Amino acid sequence: MSDDIKKRFDFPNSLIQSQAVGHLIAAVLKEHGVSEKIHQSTNQTAALNLLWEKCCSDHVVVRTACSEGLVALVAQGHAEFSYVLNGILNLTPSARNMSGLIKALMKLLQMQALREGQSGEKDIQDIYSIRNPPQPLITVLEHRPDCWPLLLQQLTAFFQQCPERSEASCVQIMAPFLWYLYCEPSQLEEYAKLRLSLLKVLLQPRGVCEEAQLSVREQSTLQLCCSMLPCLQMKDLMQTTEMMLFVEEVYLSLLRHPGFWKSQLTQLTLQLLCICEVSLKITGECSSLIHLLERSVELLGEDFPVELVIIGIALLLLQMPASQQKPLLNLALKLLSLTEGQKIPKASLLLLVPLLQILSSTALEDCLAMGEEGPSRQQLALSLVEVLQKERHGDDSHTISCRLAFPVSSMYGSIFTAWRILDVIGEESATSDWLATVESLLSATTVIPPHVFLLLAYLLVEDVGQNLQQILRVTTQLAQADSSQVPNLIPVLMFKLGRPLDPVSYNHILYTLPTLGVHKVCVGQILRVIQLLGTTPRLRAVTLRLLTSLWEKQDRVYPELQRFMAVSDAPSLSVGKELQWEKLIAKAASIRDICKQRPYQHGADMLAAISQVLNECTKPDQATPAALVLQGLHALCQAEVVCIRSTWNALSPKLSCDMRPLILKTLSELFSLVPSLTVNTVEYENFKVQVLSFLWTHTQNKNPTVASAAYKSLSHFSAGEHTILHLPEKIRPEMPVPGELDEEESVDLSIPGACFLRLLTITAPSVLPALEEFFTSLVRQEMVNMPRGIYHSALKGGVRSDQGKTVAGIPNFILKTYETNKQPGLKPGLAGGMLFCYDLAMYQSKDGKPLNRLMASRGRSFKQTTLALIHEVHVQLSEWHRAIFLPQAWLAYMTRAYHAILQGRIAELELQLQHGKEGPEEVQYKRSTAWLWVRDMLTDEITKTAAKESPVVKANALLALSSLAVVVSKHEASLCSDSDGVLEIQPNFLPVKEWVSMVLNTLLVIVDSHYHPSGQLFTCFYHKSYSGENTASAIARSAAATALSLLVPVFIISCKEKVEEILNMLTARLPGKPSADESQAVQIHMGLALGMFLSRLCEEKLSDMSGQQMNLLLMKSLDALESCCFDPSLEYNTGCILGVGLALSLMSHSSHTESRVHVAASLRKLSTYLDESGSQSRTFQEVLVYTLSCVCTSAFSAGIIEAAEAEDIMSKLQLLVENNQQTSGFALALGNLVYGLSVCGHGKAEDLGNRLRPSWIKVVLTEGAPTMLCLAALHGLVALVGSDVDVMQLKSEAIQNTHFQARLNEVIRTLTEVISVSGVIGLQSNAIWLLGHLHLSTLSSNQSRTSVPTDYSYLPEGSFIRAAIGFFITGGKKGPEAVPPSLLKVVMKPIATVGESYQYPPANLAALLSPLMRLNFGEEIQQLCLEIAVTQAPSSQSAASLLGLWVMPPLIHGLSLNIKKYLLVSMPLWAKHVSDEQIQGFVENLMVEVFKTASQPCHPEMCLSALQGLSQAMKLPSPSHHLWSLLCDATGRIFDLLPNRIRRNDLELYISIAKCLSEMTDEGVNQVSQITKDNIEKAAFVKLYLVSQGRLPLMSLTDLLTAAMQHPEKETLAWMILHSLYQARIVNHANTGVLKRLEWLLELMGYVRNIAYQSAPIQNVAPEEALDFLMLIFAAAVVAWADHEAPLLLGLSASWLPWHQQNGPGGPAAALLGRSPMHRVTVQEVLTQLPRSMLLLLQKEPWKEQTQKFIDWLLSIMEIPNKAFAAKSKDLLKATLLSLRVLPEFKKKAVWTRAYGW
């Protein structure tokens, strides 16, 4: 039978062939049975095989019938559907003829669609997929793409013949195939014809009439097409063309039923806009799409998305060729016409930029558009501009009715975000914020996105003045960042100029035009605009200035500038005087600018113009142009284009007599160049002299401006160039008469420092700031030229150099007498004289270098003499006068001896190096430790001597050792100043502090036998008694007690805490006390020692450096001493009386009022005591009289008592002397008093001295006069010339004149004559002692006794710093009534200013500044005092001590806010130099205290200052453990006190606290900023800031995100995180590098996946809420890291404070961070920008390498159950995936099918 059927198939007759097919099917049914279904596992019979074979037959009838037979078998239930379907698909790849199979396949699919659609049991869409299982037609097309015509044919029939009731099913069953055909990413060309042809079939309406009712098939098909549209590719020309055809067909189909498809039409309108942009870029054509948009305007009406389309039109117009613009302009006009009678949308103003660009374009473009119908582009543009100008603009507060979930391109995201930003920046504060953020980012980008530019142009057009300057500034910076925007900007500026504005705004806009000339291409357009302005006569002056500004940007404009300047010179009768004046001013200003900007290129061209202006402008009211061109001349001279001297020679005939203030001011400024242009010629030096004379003359000009300019110019000259001849005559010092000078001497014309200060008295208040600047230059120059050695010598102490020949000869005289003496009785006196003045000359070679051999010999001589003096100096406890000065004599001698021996040691080492006995390294080491070697050598020698010798030797040894301790300590301090405060520790030598402690402990053990020292002792000075106590001789105890006063400078430097201990010890041993010494002499010396100790503390100004507790202790000790002094029942209180005298004398110079009152009361008490002392011993009276003389002199010199009271006491002493002529103490006291009062200007005292001196000399030189009478006269004589001046701390320099020198020389000659001639041993011995004492007191400067000098008297007389400090002292003594604060400030400010850069030479700054701080000089003086203390604290312990007092309560509470702010900010400079207690008090009572308010800081500036100081202090290198702990604790406390919610104007506080935390360890940071419910916002901000700066790794954000998910205001935290992530990208740090960011983002994606699939637990928050927040953070990271375009639009900034200092404390600045409308929009629009940014990010390295991971993650998150993830978020993920459809990784079928939902 099969053979028969085969024959029939071959028979060429269709009827026979059809019958054969019927027979074959019957055979198949027979073979398989009627009841059994044919399926896959059924035996393949011959008939069945033949049937399958003939389905591919060459005969069309056979294959068609066979295929239909197979379908019939399925339809009748004889074969399974899947069997036949799979059989057809299996035959597809190899079949010769496919028509039958495809037809059968279509029949099967139709059958399946009908069956499944009717049953409704199974969703038809679930039957097939694109990939698994694939829709059968996909398989066919993939295997046989050549069969597309057959497919098209059958598909056409399929859709046309589809029953109405199954239309939806038929479309659904074809949906996978259609998705594959149109949306497959590769978009194969071989399918193109099928796609295009099939589209017409799909969208063909069912009815004949277009108005027919919408069929189900049509509805389903259009819905399918609309859903496919976002997935279509538009990568190349072919794809874009297909997309355009596709969207046109779909759009036209939708338009047939616009009412039904209103929503889709609205969405498709926006899609059309996006396609237009892509089409423009690829094809250059989009007019057909624009026509579609036009059609939908009428149809959609109010539902048309006008705002978004208008923004899109504006963007398209900017990038569209002119030929394409007309349809868009028509569309825009139609859109705006819809709103007639209503407010047009605010967004419509964005059209202005392209419209103005069209209007400003050339006519050439219109020539190219010839033949077009209707209005031209310019006419349309003009119509639109008119509409925009006439109509009012709406608020656009309504929301967009339709929002695209899946836009076809990124344009939609930009449009929508721009619309949102536009909506929110209408408010002034939001505008300012957005502009500030844009401004901060312009430096990071070179391409400005057009929508950002449009928004800026909108703001420029709409602004009414509030933000105009900011807008114009951003405009200028935008032009610099992207010069391609300039042509668009210029028409907008011109448009703005055409609107009504205030004159200032017009000016700002005009001067913005030249700043846009950033590229040569833009210059022509700007130049034309400026030239157009110049055609108006009233604007010619402005035009010239604009041209000059443009020339500054582009030198190529110079010819035009020259031409316009020449034209402006031409006289014009039509122009008024006012306009001529403006032109002249403009010309002069332009000349100045040309000279300043490019003096070398064009300066020479301007000389003629300068000369012309100077010649023309000679009248008083024409000074301004002349001054302007002189400024230009200033620039030419500065650039050395012209010679300043020659220039002045040419100008001086015209200008030397010019009295116009403005000209004089400008000339002074010109002359400030003279020092910097110096030429080494005589002519130039003469010129400089002329200039100086000119400037000094005009410092006294009555016009403050001229005088100020003169002083400012003088500040540029060297201080040495000013002479006393320059000074005004009123303040000029007396000049020496030339005839009185020696032949070799020249007249010294240098100005003493004090003379500069006299300028204060003749300077007008308004000129004082300029004088201050001049003083500052003097101070700075002096510090620059300050000799390095001055620091060393000042700390070391020294002698005055102004000694006469007679005084200088004393040491040699005593030395020769000592060496030739053969009388044992003279030995003690000679030893005393040697102690006071022994010194040997320094030996130097011809080149001024010391001779090493002789220096070594000098050192050995000093060593031998030291040991001899220890043995020979006589110590007698009963000699009270010598007891006062012996310690000081030893200190002066040991100072000379130590340095001489040290120099000798260094010289010996140099000799050893020269002779090769030592290597260079060994010598270098020994040189560096020589000062310690000398210390130890002398210590050994002194202690060895003291071990075996008498009590007198021990006493001298103690004084020598104590003096050595002082000298070594000072030397160490000077070394520290030389080595910037750091001395290398020497392991082979005992540290100085420990060695000094040994000396001190030894003294204390000797004074108090019960004292238990903590360290080692020098045991050679005492011995153990049987009871185990340390005992020493009375002389040793007395010497130890008085030696303690020598160590006061050491206590001040290193161990101030010992002061209290010593005061208590000495006070306890006063006469009459339970612990008083058994020895009467020791009791006397204890009182003297306490007085000496107190006097030295007063001399050190300890009360100015210490707190109230120390002052109370000093007064308590003084009270105890005075109690003993005035207690008549005590027998051995003469030492107390002397001690009181010494203490009160020094206390007189205190600035404390209570101290001065106390001195006055005690003086009167002493005077009364003297009156009542008739019954006392002669010694008692001598001591009392001497004490009275010292206190009286000091009190008078300090102004405590009047001249009359001093005269009364002087008369009382004179009477005593007359009645007791042989009493040395009385004569000494009277001489002392007369000298002191004379020095202080007491006339009667000077008269008395002139009478006493000759009478006493006569007594001394009278042969045979009684010895005691001569001795008294000798004491009186030396006192008359100041032998005891050191006790009273008088400045004897006041009478260092020739008359005083003559009197001094006369006394010295008298003493030497007594020593040489007298035969009385006792008289000779005393005379020698007195002569040495007089030498020391004449030469010594009291700075050698104090730890640091009390002032700068050791600086030369010409020193301005010395004079300034003297002025401070005067102010401190006389108060603000005598020294006005305004003048004091002029002197103090330079010292404070220069002190910031230099460390001043040593001085007791606490004593200098403390009175000024306490007296009522005002806040400014107080601050300057503290500024000096702060800057000098590193090198000045006294400054640090003063500062320490004022940074603690109670003093700190009395300071003003400004001073407190300064102390807070400057804390890093001084924190390491005050005590732990003081810095702790400062931190607790000020730094932390300012934050302690209920809700917000009461003084934001104070808080900010506190944090600035704290953050800088935490950066200090190597802080102490206490300081570091204190700072960390303060940081934590301040963080806790800051409000959780961050106000904008407080943001800097949080940044500052974050900077503080950044200095701590990670553990410390986490501990302080641990996130809790109450502090989450501030803790989050701090961590985010640290992450953004790279201080913390990005991975540390995990805990923050976990906490943030539970926070109710997540948007606030999201805003912070967004900014942090963006700034992490900008900051260059290892922790914020791109790989670290990639790692963190992948980690975040994993975290999100775990939460989505419930792998990671979350608490207190719904999963969908947590996922939404984390998706927002993911989007933030992607947007922040993809590019700068989206951040620029969104308002992200390059810093946390882009708006810094733009808003005051109120208004928008007070808003909470992250909560403003602008901030909310920023966060929300991050999601809109995600699809675009994700594509950009994955196209960059190294992100592109992880593209597959990102795609897989997006797919996995998108596919989680709906209830776990909101639909809106899923749409966002899908849109993001669709944006990646151009990437290679997306083209994998497994990827794109999942992305499309298949």
UniProtKB/Swiss-Prot annotation:
The keyword Acetylation applies. One of its GO terms (cellular component) is cytosol. The keyword Cytoplasm applies. Pfam families: DUF3730, Focadhesin. One of its GO terms (biological process) is regulation of post-transcriptional gene silencing. Keywords: Acetylation, Cell junction, Cytoplasm. Interacts with VCL. This is Focadhesin. It comes from Mus musculus.
